[in-house]
Swiss-Prot record:
Top-level taxon of the source organism: Bacteria
Keyword vocabulary terms for this entry: Isoprene biosynthesis, Nucleotidyltransferase, Transferase
Protein name (record): 2-C-methyl-D-erythritol 4-phosphate cytidylyltransferase
Function: Catalyzes the formation of 4-diphosphocytidyl-2-C-methyl-D-erythritol from CTP and 2-C-methyl-D-erythritol 4-phosphate (MEP).
Species assigned in the record: Wigglesworthia glossinidia brevipalpis
NCBIfam families attached to this UniProt entry: ispD
Pfam families assigned to the protein according to its UniProt record, in alphabetical order: IspD
Length: 229
């Protein structure tokens, strides 16, 4: 068994996800009789080192209370904000007595336990944190309107995945600085980058996909059925 210090896991889950075309947020779409959110949470619930799981939901969320996972004592609900950053900040207000936090996408249900273990090992070598990431193998184009501007060299490009691991005090401080400047970020590691911190990249599996479009459901269903252990 791998030993880790106690951590708290945050799920920003206040988004609406209108691109999926459903009448309810995409985290509540079911795959194998469980919602995407439940699949995303499942890997963390039974971990001894996970002290608490904070789920930031929309104040108009009528679906979460129907989930059976709410009965688990580790699960705590907080009201999220209009943006991902606001939701994470809301959850951080309820974090105490730990040095490390994980932030994981509510609609990333295919996380593999080996990737999680690799990420947590960074606690032993970095005082700041790390993110799971996957190298980009596709050719990447910079656009100018609807035209190609130029091709970007991909040898140093990575796709940021989640979960992302952070020293609690550093994350809180960096988010405070970024929001005070009115800057918009799309993940928490960007806040630390802008504050000058160097985070480790941990090579993660490419099947750790984020559900964004309807076609992603087919991939997630395949991975959950055949790959996830």
């Amino acid at each position: 068994m791998i030993n880790h210090p106690e951590i708290i896991v945050i799920f920003p889950a206040a988004g609406i996800g209108k691109r999926m075309g459903y009448k309810y947020p995409k985290q509540y779409i079911k795959i194998k009789n469980k919602t995407i959110l439940e699949h995303s949470i499942s890997l963390f619930i039974d971990k001894i080192y996970v002290k608490k799981i904070l789920i930031a939901i929309n104040k108009k969320d009528y679906w979460f209370n129907k989930l059976s996972i709410l009965k688990n004592k580790k699960i705590n609900i907080v009201i999220g904000g209009k943006s991902r950053t606001e939701s994470v900040i809301s959850a951080l207000k309820f974090v105490s007595k730990v040095d490390w936090v994980l932030v994981h996408d509510a609609v990333r249900p295919c996380l593999h336990k080996n990737d999680l273990n690799k990420l947590l090992k960074v606690i032993n070598i970095s005082p700041f944190g790390a993110i799971l990431a996957a190298p980009i193998y596709d050719t990447v184009k910079k656009s100018y309107g609807n035209f190609i501007s130029h091709t970007i060299k991909r040898n140093k490009l990575w796709r940021a995945l989640t979960p992302q691991l952070f020293n609690l005090k550093i994350l809180i401080n960096c988010l405070k600085i970024i929001t005070s400047k009115g800057e918009i970020i799309t993940d928490e590691s960007s806040a630390l980058e802008k504050c000058g911190y160097k985070l480790n990249l941990v090579h993660g599996r490419s099947d750790n996909i984020k559900i964004t479009y309807p076609e992603d459901l087919n991939f997630a269903n395949f991975f959950i059925n055949n790959i996830k252990e």
